[in-house]
From Swiss-Prot:
InterPro entries: Asp/Orn_carbamoyltranf_P-bd (IPR006132), Asp/Orn_carbamoylTrfase (IPR006130), Asp/Orn_carbamoylTrfase_sf (IPR036901), Asp_carbamoyltransf (IPR002082), Asp_carbamoyltransf_Asp/Orn-bd (IPR006131), Asp_carbamoyltransf_reg_N (IPR020545), Asp_carbamoylTrfase_reg (IPR002801), Asp_carbamoyltrfase_reg_C (IPR020542). It comes from Treponema denticola (strain ATCC 35405 / DSM 14222 / CIP 103919 / JCM 8153 / KCTC 15104). Residues 371-535 are annotated as: Aspartate carbamoyltransferase regulatory region. This is Protein PyrBI. The gene is pyrBI. It catalyses: carbamoyl phosphate + L-aspartate = N-carbamoyl-L-aspartate + phosphate + H(+). Coiled coil: none annotated. It comes from the Bacteria. Pathway: Pyrimidine metabolism; UMP biosynthesis via de novo pathway; (S)-dihydroorotate from bicarbonate: step 2/3. It is an enzyme of class 2 (transferase). One of its GO terms (biological process) is 'de novo' UMP biosynthetic process.
């Protein structure tokens, strides 16, 4: 039977389906019990037990718990464990991520555990390593585990969090009401919950953070897409003034050092808003538990140490569970366990593309084909193109700015013609943009895709001998890729030019008709994903 987990990467929490995570948690429950009871027979069911099986820790950012948790998990498996010394590695000589990891994969290393400030790096390495594996006929396809990438995600922390929540919920997946408290902007552990909490049938999330530390919009949108009920509060004090208080509280450390001087001036006020105080205890419902990915700040802990010996303490067992979860994850990816998984096939991470986002409009030769004036001041042309209805409904300044972007992206800088901002013939108060170019123009399917990506909801008219030869209406494509001038606006993203990795930007459409970067998840409008066209 084919093992569905062997060689799989975990770059974001959604790389494992809900059924696959339930399988992992069931196995973790079994292994944890075996270790506590020193049941060697059950432990051996999980052990990789192969001295030639290479697991490599590559931590390019400081870590204690995650690194040591993985190290101890790997030692349990009795494998070849290596650790890249980042300070003396070829990264400091300007070597790319792809070259470094391909080299290490060539030395018969099978699983890479990676922590980096660069967001989306594991997703890129997964794609790159697949090609390297095939070119060089390696014994195993390298797998990558994201141990935290910038402020993006921390999927193994999400796994151990979920396991602990479920363990404390009598192994029920029915519902969860959770309060996320602290630095929700930088805290990648809370970002993973936007998809991770889908494992519960009913999810209610209370976001508790001042505006400066609030959850990024992308993750709030993801929660809403996933059917979560989401509420927002600016402080613990405000949250406890209302009656519907969660039993599960998840705190994160404020990372104020990553923010500017204006925020640092308010640090005492910001910390106070997300730090639990003694007077709050009497306002908590019975059976409330607190969790924290750790570490706690020794001077300014959001969960003060006076709570350590109280029933609120769920964070210590949560930390211990991390090693058990990671033991099982390594066992699954190595193919030691997983043959007995009977869940459905995982859905492809590729987005659906077989939809009509370029629609050819039928031309009525007796009437519609005659070129009429598109707008006041724009005379009909005999041959050429007219792109109409650009940014309909926007302000004239916005329309003009985006028309210049369309001209650059579509390569329409040369030749005669012009641009015009006008009002709609049907709605005089609604502005739209028009680009017209007389001359001989041909539009390939690739050109139409490009136009759809940069000028959604416009109309393209191809004109010959004074008649409309063909007409197309554009809509937002489900994915945008294979264009050199695409750019993710997040400088920490592996695909951003600032990283000098040569990774092509790829975007997929969200449910609210915007675009998310495939690597880091940053949300863009279709107007924001284009850089300057490369010559």
């Amino acid at each position: 039977m084919e093992n569905k987990f062997m060689g799989r990467s975990l770059t974001v929490i959604d790389d494992l389906s809900i059924d696959e995570r339930k399988y992992l948690f069931d196995k973790t429950k079994r292994l944890k019990k075996a270790i506590q009871e020193d049941d060697q027979k059950v432990m051996d069911e999980f052990r990789i037990n192969d001295k030639d099986f290479g697991i490599y820790e590559v931590f390019l950012e400081p870590s204690t718990r995650t690194k040591e948790s993985f190290r101890n998990a790997a030692k349990f498996h009795q494998v070849k464990l290596s650790d890249l010394a980042a300070e003396s590695s070829s990264f400091n000589k300007g070597e790319s991520y792809a070259d470094t990891f391909n080299t290490l994969a060539g030395y018969q290393n099978s699983i890479f555990i990676v922590r980096s400030k660069v967001e989306g790096v594991c997703r890129w390495l997964e794609d790159e390593a697949q090609a390297f594996y095939q070119r060089n006929n390696l014994k195993r396809k390298p797998a990558f585990i994201n141990a935290g990438d910038g402020k993006h995600e921390h999927p193994t922390q999400e796994l151990l969090d979920e396991f602990t929540f479920i363990e404390d919920n009598n192994w029920s997946f029915d519902k969860i009401h959770i309060a996320l408290v602290g630095d929700l902007y930088h805290g990648r552990t809370v970002h993973s919950k936007a998809d991770g909490l889908k494992i519960f049938k009913s999810v209610k999330v209370d976001l508790i953070a001042p505006a400066e530390l609030a959850m990024p919009e992308y993750y709030k949108v993801r929660m809403q897409e996933n059917g979560f009920t989401v509420r927002e509060f600016s402080s613990i004090e405000e949250y406890l003034r209302q009656a519907d208080v969660a039993l599960i509280w998840y705190f994160t450390r404020p990372q104020l050092e990553r923010m500017g001087e204006q925020v640092l001036k308010k640090q005492d006020e910001l910390r106070r808003s997300i730090t639990f105080r003694k007077e709050f205890i009497e306002k908590l419902p019975e059976n409330t538990r607190f969790y924290h990915p750790l570490p706690r700040h020794r001077v300014h802990p959001t969960i003060p140490t006076f709570l350590d010996a109280t029933p609120l303490n769920g964070w210590e067992r949560q930390s211990i569970n991390g090693m058990y979860v990671r033991m099982v994850l390594l066992s699954m990816i190595a193919g030691k366990i997983g043959d007995d998984y009977k869940g459905p096939e995982p859905k492809s991470c590729e987005r659906v593309e077989d939809e009509d986002y370029i629609v050819e409009v039928p031309i009525n030769n007796s009437k519609e084909s005659k070129v009429e004036t598109f707008s006041e001041g724009v005379r009909p042309i005999q041959n050429g193109i007219v792109i109409d209805h650009i940014c309909r409904g926007d302000k004239p300044s916005v329309i003009r700015h985006h028309m210049s972007k369309i001209i650059n992206v579509m390569g329409l800088e040369e030749g005669k013609g012009g641009e015009w901002v006008s009002t709609s013939t049907k709605d005089k108060g609604t502005f739209k943009g028009i680009i017209f170019r007389p001359g001989e123009y041909k539009f390939s399917r690739a050109d139409l895709k490009r136009l759809s990506a940069v000028a959604s909801s416009c109309t393209l008219n191809l004109i010959k001998d004074g008649k409309i030869q063909s007409k197309y209406r554009t809509h937002l494509p489900p994915r945008i890729y294979n264009f050199e001038d695409l750019i993710c606006k997040n400088e920490a993203c592996i695909s951003h030019p600032a990283q000098s990795e040569g990774v092509p930007a790829i975007f997929y459409r969200t449910i609210d008709n915007r675009y998310a970067c495939q690597y880091c998840g940053t949300i863009h409008t279709f107007k924001e994903i284009w850089g300057e066209k490369k010559n």
